[in-house]
Amino acid sequence: MNIIDISSWQASIDLAAVFANNPLDGVVVKATQGTSYTNPEFSKWVSWLDKNDKPYGFYHYLDGGDANAEAEHFYSVVKPYINKGIPVADYEGDALVKGTVWLKRFLDRFRELSGVKPMIYCSLSVVQTQNFSALTDHPLWIAQYADMNPVYGFVDNPWQKGSVAPFNGYVMHQYTSCGRLKGYDGNLDFDKFYGNRDAWDGLCAGENDTSKLKPADPQIVLRTLKNEFGVNEARRNALRAQGYDPDSVQETINRLYAVGGNVKRDIGKDLSYLNSILWIVRSI
């Protein structure tokens, strides 16, 4: 899914025009910052997105002050939209000095209030230099850019390099801050969400405990064999966004090749054939 994220820096944006003129799927809106700031455009934008049934999220820019107070301020503003949009903790700037123990306090307090585990947004370099081992049950949204050149229109497979360990993957990638779309005269953050609308709505509804991924089933294996989810890290991210354990899916595919020969060649669109092969695999 093609996503943009916006703040008051894009106050002049006409969401209706941008959606009408581009293959845009959804928007993440800045809601709050610190313990008192609220984006003056937040209510207008989110109300429009909600009314028009567009996928959306909302983020809190962490200032690194009182973690509980920041979570409470965020919740007080986004409360009407809980379970409708994805909540995000924007971990950058001054908050980085406080570290992930502080971040966990914010995340835990917001979850107490809302019942939803927020997504974590940060740069890939932060994931690689700080200890996120206690936070891997939160969905991850990374920022990593190939360069700072203008990007005209969305990219299907944005460049990404480097591990996100200890996370098993990420569900969204901000790949430029210099994106350009028809209907808006300015730079935009472009993001790729590795999932469909159902996966997005699942994250809104609190179904974002990534420790509860489903094992492989015939339908998801068939879709994977048909290359619906891409390859390598993109595939893992997409499967996780669909709610499936990518390791279970890959293990099943490996066993299918071992038992069934050239499964990808033979399987075609025949789900009954795949079911029969899976029955053999499970019987071993």
Predicted features along the sequence, with ranges:
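Functionally critical loop-and-helix segments that line ligand-binding/catalytic clefts
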Residues: 1-10, 17, 21, 135-136, ...
